[in-house]
Amino acid sequence: MTNQYEAVGLKAKEYEGIVEMLGREPNELELNLYGVMWSEHCSYKHSRSMFKHFPTSGPSVLQGPGENAGIVDIGDGLAIAMKIESHNHPSAIEPYQGAATGVGGIIRDIFAMGARPIALLNSLRFGELEGDARVKYLLEGVVEGIAGYGNCMGIPTVGGEVYFNQSYRGNPLVNAMCVGLIEHDAIHRGTASGVGNSIMYVGAATGRDGIGGASFASATLTEESEEKRAAVQVGDPFMEKLLLEACLELLKTGSIIGIQDLGAAGLVSACCETATRGEGGMEIDVLKVPRRETGMVPVEVMISESQERMLLIVERGREEEVNEIVKKWGLHSVIIGRVTNDDKLRIFEGDKVVGEIPAESLDSSGAPRYEPDYAPPADLAELQKLDIESIPEPRDLSSTLRKLLASPNIASKEWIYRQYDHMVRTNTVIKPGSDAAVLRIRGTKKGIALTTDCNSRYCYLDPREGSKIAVVEAARNIVCSGGKPIAITDGLNFGSPETPEGYWQFRESVLGLSEACREMDTPVISGNVSFYNQTEKGSIHPTPIVGMVGLIEDISKTCTMAFKEAGDIIVLLGQTKAEIGGSEYLASIHGQEKGKIPHLNLSLEKRLQKEVLALIQGDLVQSAHDLSEGGLAVGVAECAIAGGIGARVEVNTELRNDIVLFSESQSRFLMTIKPEHLETVQERLKQSNIPHEQLGTVIGNELQMQINGNVVVKESIGELEEIWRGALQCLMESMKID
């Protein structure tokens, strides 16, 4: 028979610790509160000990990890708030609502800081798409959910990434990122301080949806998980839009001491987090909490994850001022408690105390911490072995390029992003489909560049080096758009931390991210960890997603990947080596997921990025694109397709033809230069000791690639574009979903 504490997800030692701390056994309500608050999703009990490795401060960081979102200065008294969070398990069970409420939750985190949300991004992972109706159902539902919520909120979804791999077959990943704009003096935090100040509840009424959501997100997905649809929240974007406007207006009045959204674990989480930050306590009465269902008991009220709700700490005597503004926006507000001078979270049901717990003991800072044993997977050494000579070289490399452009991981994601409103508010300068999205900051000359990145196949084969590559690839995308990378938010998605292999993958990824962020001067200002992304058949590939923001001082100096004019000179920065381990070429063409991933030289990477950005800002670059999945051939094709113009490329090398075309060697940029600027650019690259070579010319309507004088690729740009743009839509339409 299962013990009561096991039923709420606690271990025997954890329960014993609770009894010792309280000096008594917890009652049913208290036990349930510990169950959700000490779940992995809320407590970070297996990951928190690794956070110390992250660089989290810097001259531009105004708020690092620990609040609802991180904030970084962009000058002119303005700042950017940003955060990424996962909603993986809910999206696996109920893809539309799972994705929609993931978007809603991250938006609330941003406006809880006092920032107006200005952009959304996402990073998605699914199983192999071809011939799998279940994967198509999940993809359709997730995309519709993201679009349905973001579009209704009037916040543009400007970028993201989508990858397909069989490791995500039963456990898709849905990571949502939100970015907000805020003035320095408007920053607010989730702190409950000032004894006697009122605790006010604002927004939607509380129901039973989402009960146990935090615990559900902290468990392995099984066949029985379908029965837990009640743990998936239901969102209302129109309610959230009203809530956003009401909260931003309230924050301008000076009446709000602290503000916190009701997200994972609902009311109990918001109460204990704000009380702990304020180093005090709190009393609340569950009978005063608005409900939309009858018969709800205190524990249901406390842990419900109903959406579109906020907790406000209001200066005593100004409650009516709050009520009037909330009412103006068609919402409901009510006083449910007050700040106290002890350290307790005291829960009343009318006059009766039904729970009394030290607030800090519920908070993640008071939860147990674990540092499990770790070891690399037993088959890792074998996985990393790859004899390139055993890989047959395709006879028709044009056909190989066409196949790669049709791969769902490389093909255009237009089928997805055309469902998103990416132009609402008319600040989007560079739209989805380029290396990074770019938004103007109205009233200034500035802009920001935004991207999300992670090659999870690299992280599967080498989590530390793969995580470094995630950081620098994000930075490359920012730089290619004309921005200087300034900060990241990380979404760390892994399997179980309770296996040596799972924790080793997580630990290695954190160390890799930390090293790269330190070298690239991009502090980690916020983030999220999602463990137990696995099914009974196995774990997902390690997926540490990097969301990055870059600053563009002069919005007129942005850059895109598109080839611009016939006669422009194509220049490759960096060196191509025999590195196809973990590549899209090896996986898509040869069906192998193995090998040593490409080597990364962080020092060279930093020098390269600095020089590329300087060249773009100096108006010496026509187009810029980083080379990643698919290598040189795919990169040139993408630039040609984007510009609607062809290219002639010539390479002299001792490498095999397929390796020249499809190697994914790191620290490479493809740029086009006007002929009159070529000498200047080459001299600057030479002075900076940047390896580079002139590859060819932008010309005509064909892509022609020669290696050692032999034409190995000759394709019509129009035909390549048709393949690239149509591949994903063709796959989605090949098996209609009822």
Curated annotation (Swiss-Prot):
GO terms for molecular function: ATP binding; magnesium ion binding; phosphoribosylformylglycinamidine synthase activity. ATP binds at Y44, K83, D490, G527. Substrate binds at S86, H87, N88, H89, R108, Q233, E305, S306, Q307, S530. Pathway: Purine metabolism; IMP biosynthesis via de novo pathway; 5-amino-1-(5-phospho-D-ribosyl)imidazole from N(2)-formyl-N(1)-(5-phospho-D-ribosyl)glycinamide: step 1/2. It is found in: Cytoplasm. InterPro entries: PRibForGlyAmidine_synth_PurL, PurL_linker, PurM-like_C_dom, PurM-like_C_sf, PurM-like_N, PurM-like_N_sf. CDD domains: PurL_repeat1, PurL_repeat2. One of its GO terms (biological process) is 'de novo' IMP biosynthetic process. SUPFAM superfamilies: PurM C-terminal domain-like, PurM N-terminal domain-like. It catalyses: N(2)-formyl-N(1)-(5-phospho-beta-D-ribosyl)glycinamide + L-glutamine + ATP + H2O = 2-formamido-N(1)-(5-O-phospho-beta-D-ribosyl)acetamidine + L-glutamate + ADP + phosphate + H(+). Signal peptide: none annotated. It is an enzyme of class 6 (ligase). Mg(2+) 1 binds at E85, N528. Mg(2+) 2 binds at D109, D261. Keywords: ATP-binding, Cytoplasm, Ligase, Magnesium, Metal-binding, Nucleotide-binding, Purine biosynthesis. GO terms for cellular component: cytoplasm. PANTHER family: PHOSPHORIBOSYLFORMYLGLYCINAMIDINE SYNTHASE SUBUNIT PURL. Part of the phosphoribosylformylglycinamidine synthase complex involved in the purines biosynthetic pathway. Catalyzes the ATP-dependent conversion of formylglycinamide ribonucleotide (FGAR) and glutamine to yield formylglycinamidine ribonucleotide (FGAM) and glutamate. The FGAM synthase complex is composed of three subunits. PurQ produces an ammonia molecule by converting glutamine to glutamate. PurL transfers the ammonia molecule to FGAR to form FGAM in an ATP-dependent manner. Monomer. Part of the FGAM synthase complex composed of 1 PurL, 1 PurQ and 2 PurS subunits. HAMAP family: PurL_2 (MF_00420). Belongs to the FGAMS family. This is Phosphoribosylformylglycinamidine synthase subunit PurL. It comes from Alkaliphilus metalliredigens (strain QYMF). The gene is purL.
